[in-house]
């Protein structure tokens, strides 16, 4: 059994080959891409959507493997005994003697809460990082919105357009 210091979780909607995680290979890092029953049952999904989602995960795992990264891709059959994501993370971290678990901030509140609780309860070093697939980093969102204040998204979108020069011509909106 190979020992890995770091376990990096890749969720199914985080298949971004441009993420900074993949700029450098590290033999001490194991990337985990796992199909989980909990992700099929929390809301009704069309079977073709699930198949496409899992196929994309498998293809991403294969691409990372081909690029020389250590990747563990687990199918639904492989994770059948894991009741949820946290149980899976504990099992894999224990199996590979990982000291650190890293994950990218989930887009869904449900998973964000699950992983935040795991982070606070775990004896392992658990680190959350940005997904890098949005214009605005996750940690900057709090600076854009005042707590307990009504927010109009129109103003937020205008500020984003100006900051990133999207649909702006001569400092004026084009669309």
For each of these PLM feature ranges, what is it?
Residues 1-76:
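N-terminal beta-strand-loop-alpha-helix module at the start
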Residues 16, 39, 79, 109, ...:
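Surface-exposed, flexible loop/turn segments at secondary-structure boundaries
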Residues 55-58, 83-87:
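Short, contiguous clusters of charged residues that form electrostatic/catalytic patches at enzyme active sites
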Residues 76-77, 106:
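Short strand-loop junctions, especially beta-strand C-caps/beta-turns
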Residues 77-83:
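Acidic-and-aromatic substrate-binding clefts and catalytic sites of carbohydrate-active enzymes
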Residues 84-175:
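Beta-rich, aromatic/charged-enriched effector core domains that present basic-aromatic interfaces
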